[in-house]
Amino acid sequence: MPSDFISLLSADLDLESPKSLYSRESVYDLLPKELQLPPSRETSVASMSQTSGGEAGSPPPAVVAADASSAPSSSSMGGACSSFTTSSSPTIYSTSVTDSKAMQVESCSSAVGVSNRGVSEKQLTSNTVQQHPSTPKRHTVLYISPPPEDLLDNSRMSCQDEGCGLESEQSCSMWMEDSPSNFSNMSTSSYNDNTEVPRKSRKRNPKQRPGVKRRDCEESNMDIFDADSAKAPHYVLSQLTTDNKGNSKAGNGTLENQKGTGVKKSPMLCGQYPVKSEGKELKIVVQPETQHRARYLTEGSRGSVKDRTQQGFPTVKLEGHNEPVVLQVFVGNDSGRVKPHGFYQACRVTGRNTTPCKEVDIEGTTVIEVGLDPSNNMTLAVDCVGILKLRNADVEARIGIAGSKKKSTRARLVFRVNIMRKDGSTLTLQTPSSPILCTQPAGVPEILKKSLHSCSVKGEEEVFLIGKNFLKGTKVIFQENVSDENSWKSEAEIDMELFHQNHLIVKVPPYHDQHITLPVSVGIYVVTNAGRSHDVQPFTYTPDPAAAGALNVNVKKEISSPARPCSFEEAMKAMKTTGCNLDKVNIIPNALMTPLIPSSMIKSEDVTPMEVTAEKRSSTIFKTTKSVGSTQQTLENISNIAGNGSFSSPSSSHLPSENEKQQQIQPKAYNPETLTTIQTQDISQPGTFPAVSASSQLPNSDALLQQATQFQTRETQSREILQSDGTVVNLSQLTEASQQQQQSPLQEQAQTLQQQISSNIFPSPNSVSQLQNTIQQLQAGSFTGSTASGSSGSVDLVQQVLEAQQQLSSVLFSAPDGNENVQEQLSADIFQQVSQIQSGVSPGMFSSTEPTVHTRPDNLLPGRAESVHPQSENTLSNQQQQQQQQQQVMESSAAMVMEMQQSICQAAAQIQSELFPSTASANGNLQQSPVYQQTSHMMSALSTNEDMQMQCELFSSPPAVSGNETSTTTTQQVATPGTTMFQTSSSGDGEETGTQAKQIQNSVFQTMVQMQHSGDNQPQVNLFSSTKSMMSVQNSGTQQQGNGLFQQGNEMMSLQSGNFLQQSSHSQAQLFHPQNPIADAQNLSQETQGSLFHSPNPIVHSQTSTTSSEQMQPPMFHSQSTIAVLQGSSVPQDQQSTNIFLSQSPMNNLQTNTVAQEAFFAAPNSISPLQSTSNSEQQAAFQQQAPISHIQTPMLSQEQAQPPQQGLFQPQVALGSLPPNPMPQSQQGTMFQSQHSIVAMQSNSPSQEQQQQQQQQQQQQQQQQQSILFSNQNTMATMASPKQPPPNMIFNPNQNPMANQEQQNQSIFHQQSNMAPMNQEQQPMQFQSQSTVSSLQNPGPTQSESSQTPLFHSSPQIQLVQGSPSSQEQQVTLFLSPASMSALQTSINQQDMQQSPLYSPQNNMPGIQGATSSPQPQATLFHNTAGGTMNQLQNSPGSSQQTSGMFLFGIQNNCSQLLTSGPATLPDQLMAISQPGQPQNEGQPPVTTLLSQQMPENSPLASSINTNQNIEKIDLLVSLQNQGNNLTGSF
């Protein structure tokens, strides 16, 4: 810019040689100066900006340039210089010092020069130079812009400016005309005047003159200041000084003279000087405060600037010098090169105790001078300096209008000393302080009072806030947790029309959660630019009264609505409508409807909000939280199903305590009051499961919880249940959400389907073929219907799973014909043993339940076993009839047991409720109803009708003990065994400690459990549910492999446990037990778990306690138990159970632990990967499984309950093999042979437990063997094949022979495969209708797979899970069903959030599997398992956890969708997925249908995340497990 350039030049010129400048300026005359005027002004502005820049250093060059430039430039330079000189104060100051010379020179040059000299004093020599030609210009300048630039500062420029363009001040010209001193005096005065007086009248006053004398110095300073221009209003200073010091004009004059000398001595204010030089240092010992409100000219003193403590004052010390000197203090700019401030001046503060000081004006800037004395150690606390805010007019005059536009409210105190050297020269030291904010701090806003303290969640009410400092830009914030930035907060709308500094009117924003049931307290605070109000006012959001009823209703609706979208009345009507169904088809209607009825009844009763809630829950449970209510209902159903082996079991379970139950059921359906009574009865008589389920099938879980807790507690527990249920509901509610949608259809369809199923299944039990047909119909039609309703999602999943399991059971029932005898024998033996064991165990498990349990196991199991044999012999219908009868007995026992359990497991019941709910949730009813029902159902189906009945008894009667047992026993074990289950976790953990593998497994398992717990931790109940679920899911998974395991996590378990467990799936109790055995194994010692899984416990106990004694049972149970044993073997039962659990969870965990993920993958994936990856642990886990299978195989071979055992084992190995014992036996023979080989490889221990243990150990040690063993099972796991050729035997059959050994080995695992292929064909249905069962059943019938399928039918879900190679989709499908389980597991494993999507878990699992060592095979397996979900769930017990929760939600919600959407495709996709590698992606799209969303997401992630996540998950699991241990302990 010209001005900048000129200012530089002018400053330089000035600095360099005032004389030459002067002569040039005189040469140039006014025009040039006027020309320069604008420049000078600009310069002043520029110089202001540049002054600092061009002050000291550039002067000579600038001068040259200035010389080179014309007079105008020099004159403007003068202005610039003046402004510049400010910046280059040193030079300029010297110039001003030179001013005397300059003045002399100027005076020599001319009067103008003289006056210029005065100007130069005022301004700079350069200004003078410029101005002495431009003296008139000064007039012009002053005249032109006296006010703006007449600040001599600028006016130094100004003066120059005056000379240059500020000459407007005639006075200046006058002064110029006058003697320079006069002029300087006058101009100085005029500056003062300007400040004090209107600019026009700024002409000289007497005052000014004295000021002027000072001004001479001051003016020179001013010139400098001008250079500084904006930042030090010298006017005010002058005025102040003149006013204040006007009296001492003489003194001022003296000062002037002194300053004349002093000026010569003291450098210009804009000069830059060192802090330290020649061994002398001026330093600030105490910095001034950071904020000091400057005083205005018109107000009184604001006091001196204090230090930051407000107790003292800024302190300065001069080091290296011991002679008295004068300390100068002025106000400088806030940053950059030091120069006087344009808006603030220093002012003297006087008081009684202040240090004496004097105020001088240098270059238009007020400078406070204080003496530094050696007596004070050359240290001074500066307590006499204040800060003065200049008037805008003074600012403009001082720095020009342009400069005055740049507001700066920060300033620094500048301390300077001039030390005389011996040679007469001056050493100047200068140091600036830290910046001081010179404005009043904005008041912090404050709320003093508000007109409203609470408001409904809808908000929109007006609140009047009275307070302080509500400034522009104020915001009123409502925040939930003020200490948490991430908590909910919302800005209230302010009525700006009524906005005031002291009051505001705002509208309350709506609360984010419109469905709160309790008042929520939030904070209100005000935020302004100055910050937020220090005080946070409390404000309360209350539940919406309108919505409150609705809310309660909503809760009820949410809970019951999921069961049935209809209103409660509608639900009641529907229930009543289905009342016939309830009575007629008590199976589902009671199961399904009863919960609704209880809810509606309870609602009708409105016994208590809690009951209503419980009711809701029961509805909800029914929905998915059905899990909770359904949990017991499911238990009921399960026991019923278990008892009947079909849904008729619910009726039979209602039948069992038909008096109570039918009454209860009917009362439930029809009698709210009775319901209350019934509920009470339920509480008192948990034994009456139907009652329980009737009274609260939500309460069933509640019943467990509530009954356990008792209705009194029930309210609390209802909430707890609601809470746990909520958890379950969270788990289940997602499920419920889907199931809610799905449940009306589900209930309707499920009821219809289940009625059909119960009608079909149960009628079909009349003829096995009918069952098969019905099952096929169900699969094809019903399941399609189920799928149709399944589109509803989880409900359908549940239904599908249930139906699939029912179909399985019917198929199993029908298929078992050949196998029935064997299975019957096995069942009889097993169940007898189980009964015995259960009797033995159940006492342990259910000490109070013992009689019931004994009765049940003895009566039910033996009776059942006996009746089962005849029944299986006679037919399913006989079996079912007997089962029903037994179930009735069982249910009565179960009711007793339940009561016992409830009493025993009140706490456990809560846990279990939660467990079950979460399991139910996880199973999404799939697991619970499906798991238990299906598990019992499936397991019984898996076992055979006999087994089923047996299992039903196991499950039914043990479910009363088993289903119940799982539920009750589980509950009790939750309490005791349940605790055991969780203790299984816990114990398992404890026992785990026994063996690291065990620990790992247990920890993994528990971690899984706990992860599940954590994942499902929402309620630990869920945890437990989850754990239980896990156990259940995993165990149940195991069950549900047979059952719904595949449905969810169980699939994984299915694969792992499932195969084995499912192999022993006919001994589904065993399966269940294996779960429990796993749990049992974990809690194995805790024989309660035996009770828990009475059959399995016996198995576990048998295996653990009597490995061989219960060989028949062991075979069955060994299959499971073997798993348990195997798992529990090395570290006996904990490991066993852990392993079993590990099979899914622990094994996964083992896998997780070892290869964490692989284990996970391997677990379901097949154990192989587990083996391969975490061979030792996995192997342990899988070995346990494999050993279980092997053990089972050996058991089969050893026990040679091989036909039965094979049936059993095959059920496990080839779940389908049970029904197709003949073929499957060969197949199984192959399977088992390979497995046997594996077993043999592993080591055939006479005692399965030993084998298991050995195998576990061996597996752990002999990973290969295990791999082989597992491979055999892992045959299931394609991993085995990739991993090991021997496993490939089985495995290859899995992969390649999928058709071959798939049928045989795969029969076990690959039956899935075959089933997968077949299932692929049928799997669409299977998938759709949980076709797994269907497919399994259908394929089973279709091929030897029919036997295999029966196997898989037995554990079709296993097939699904295991049908991984070809029908991983199936697995997915089942898995989906298991999804619930998986969901549980997932939620359990939810911590392993790596698979967020349910299905993505599947993909993840595959991905994870892919990530793992034999991931692809595993992936395949898992893909098989499509259940990757499951795998993931299980695989990533850690990772699954996330999945788990997600799974629950996802699967249950997505379950039917998954099943539905992926019917045909899923199997293929699953199969594709099951095919390691690529298929995953292929399969994913269809799987995507079910799994795709999650799968695609997860599979990439899964693989990448797989290993690390698994490891992390393992760690998580371990930590979780530890937590779980604590939890279990606490539970």
Curated annotation (Swiss-Prot):
Q: Which residues fall in a compositionally biased region of kind Basic residues? A: 200-212
Q: Its domain of life?
A: Eukaryota
**Main subcellular localisation:** nucleus
Set out the biological process GO terms recorded for this chain's protein: calcineurin-NFAT signaling cascade; cellular hyperosmotic response; cellular response to cytokine stimulus; DNA damage response; positive regulation of canonical NF-kappaB signal transduction; positive regulation of gene expression; positive regulation of leukocyte adhesion to vascular endothelial cell; positive regulation of transcription by RNA polymerase II
Q: In which tissues is it expressed?
A: Widely expressed, with highest levels in skeletal muscle, brain, heart and peripheral blood leukocytes.
Query: SUPFAM superfamilies of this UniProt entry?
Result: E set domains, p53-like transcription factors
Write down the DNA-binding region ranges: 293-300
GO CC terms for this protein?
chromatin; cytosol; nucleoplasm; nucleus; transcription regulator complex
Cross-link Glycyl lysine isopeptide (Lys-Gly) (interchain with G-Cter in SUMO2) maps to which residues of the chain?
K556, K603
**Which UniProt key words apply to this protein?**
Acetylation, Activator, ADP-ribosylation, Chromosome, Cytoplasm, DNA damage, DNA-binding, Isopeptide bond, Nucleus, Phosphoprotein, Transcription, Transcription regulation, Ubl conjugation
**Compositional bias annotation for Low complexity:** 63-89, 179-192, 646-656, 879-888, 960-980, 1248-1266, 1320-1330, 1475-1486
Phosphothreonine occurs at: T135
Which positions carry Phosphoserine? S120, S134, S155, S561
Glycyl lysine isopeptide (Lys-Gly) (interchain with G-Cter in SUMO1) crosslink, residue number(s): K556
The family database entries (Gene3D superfamilies) matched by this protein are listed as: Immunoglobulins, Rel homology domain (RHD), DNA-binding domain
UniProt subcellular location: Nucleus; Cytoplasm; Chromosome
Q: Which ranges carry the RHD domain?
A: 264-443
Pfam assignment, any one: RHD_DNA_bind
Segments of skewed composition (Polar residues): 41-51, 122-134, 241-260, 841-852, 869-878, 981-996, 1224-1247, 1267-1278, 1291-1304, 1331-1371, 1487-1502
Region Disordered, as annotated, extends over 34-89, 114-141, 175-220, 241-265, 640-666, 841-891, 958-996, 1211-1304, 1316-1371, 1473-1502
Job of this protein: Transcription factor involved, among others, in the transcriptional regulation of osmoprotective and inflammatory genes. Binds the DNA consensus sequence 5'-[ACT][AG]TGGAAA[CAT]A[TA][ATC][CA][ATG][GT][GAC][CG][CT]-3'. Mediates the transcriptional response to hypertonicity. Positively regulates the transcription of LCN2 and S100A4 genes; optimal transactivation of these genes requires the presence of DDX5/DDX17. Also involved in the DNA damage response by preventing formation of R-loops; R-loops are composed of a DNA:RNA hybrid and the associated non-template single-stranded DNA.
Q: What is this protein called?
A: Nuclear factor of activated T-cells 5
Q: Which organism is it from?
A: Homo sapiens (Human)
Q: Gene name?
A: NFAT5
